[in-house]
Amino acid sequence: MLWKKTFTLENLNQLCSNSAVSHLGIEISAFGEDWIEATMPVDHRTMQPFGVLHGGVSVALAETIGSLAGSLCLEEGKTVVGLDINANHLRPVRSGKVTARATPINLGRNIQVWQIDIRTEENKLCCVSRLTLSVINL
């Protein structure tokens, strides 16, 4: 298994409470051997003035789940910080919720690269993002 830190969905969501993550309604929702997911509502908190999911909020979701994943696959005493993120917005989302899944592309000693795919409730890909993280000591 990829994960080196012990965690539950409950304690991950508790960790994210009282932050931008919880303000946007992001919830860590599932994980497997080499992936982790978070969901986010498409509502007044996450939409742009024209009635669709805000692209910057999609990027916040991607960075949230990718950074969390990056930290969880490191031994205690280490964490990650973002170096670069990009996103391609593929389709507008007007309602419901979206789910972001982070999977590793490369997990080096000093640099990690994560792929984050964001999908609609109908499982349509709406955003793809790539996140580069730097591993640091706490």
Swiss-Prot record:
InterPro entries membership = HotDog_dom_sf (IPR029069), PAAI_dom (IPR003736), Thioestr_dom (IPR006683)
EC number(s) given by UniProt: 3.1.2.-
Q: What class of enzyme is it?
A: hydrolase
- PANTHER family assigned to the protein according to its UniProt record, in alphabetical order: 1,4-DIHYDROXY-2-NAPHTHOYL-COA THIOESTERASE 1
The protein's GO terms of the molecular function aspect are: 1,4-dihydroxy-2-naphthoyl-CoA thioesterase activity
Q: Which family does it belong to?
A: Belongs to the thioesterase PaaI family.
**The organism's taxonomic lineage, starting at the top:** Bacteria, Pseudomonadati, Pseudomonadota, Gammaproteobacteria, Pasteurellales
Key word tRNA processing present in the record? no
State the protein's name.
Answer: Putative esterase HI_1161
Q: Which domain of life is it from?
A: Bacteria
- Which organism's genome codes for this protein? Haemophilus influenzae (strain ATCC 51907 / DSM 11121 / KW20 / Rd)
Going by the UniProt record, its keywords in alphabetical order are: Hydrolase
For this UniProt entry, what's an example GO CC term? cytosol
Q: Name one Pfam family in it.
A: 4HBT
